[in-house]
Amino acid sequence: WRFVNVSDPNRRATIRANFEIANADALGNCSGERAKLYATLKLDGLDKAPVQLAVFSDTQTPQGHGLGSQTMPETLAYSVVGAIQTLWLAARTQGIGVGWVSILDPTNVARALDVPDAWQFIAYLCVGYPEEEHTDPELVRHGWQDRVGLSEFILER
């Protein structure tokens, strides 16, 4: 995994512009009440987060000497997601919030940050102290989606 601390204001502005385009496209895929609700969702982490991290998977890493990547190359990306989850949990223990911005064009993010071609974009994280604390997910709280029970995801065989 590769973490890029995006601190340069010009690069942040480029990421923000990328988000604006992708967000407008996403809004265009909604209609009626769903579009109104989408437009009200809190998507301002790119403007307020003091720390912004772009996270990539190095698809040509020499680390591990390719062990397991011939049969399951996707585990490189899964390892990155595991690192993100570990960072997220550690941050939360300190009262720090993490937001995953997924409304971005991955190719444009990689280009804006001038990373090697072998780096696959996985996540853009906004990190900072939250303005307010909640125990329920924001998308549930705002009516975007109902909470789904664990039984929907766990199968017994």
Regions found by a protein language model. Name each.
Residues 11, 61, 106, 129-132:
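Surface-exposed, flexible loop/turn segments at secondary-structure boundaries
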Residues 50-52, 98, 120-124:
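Structural motif
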Residues 123-157:
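C-terminal helix-cap and adjacent tail motif
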Residues 1-2, 123:
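Extracytoplasmic/periplasmic beta-strand context in beta-sandwich domains
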Residues 2-80:
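Glycine/small-residue-rich phosphate/adenosyl-binding loop
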Residues 53, 59-112:
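Small-aliphatic-rich amphipathic alpha-helix that forms the alpha element of a beta-alpha
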Residues 44-47, 115-117, 147:
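Solvent-exposed alpha-helices and their adjacent loops that cap or buttress functional pockets
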Residues 24-30, 114-137:
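A glycine-rich helix N-cap at a beta->alpha junction
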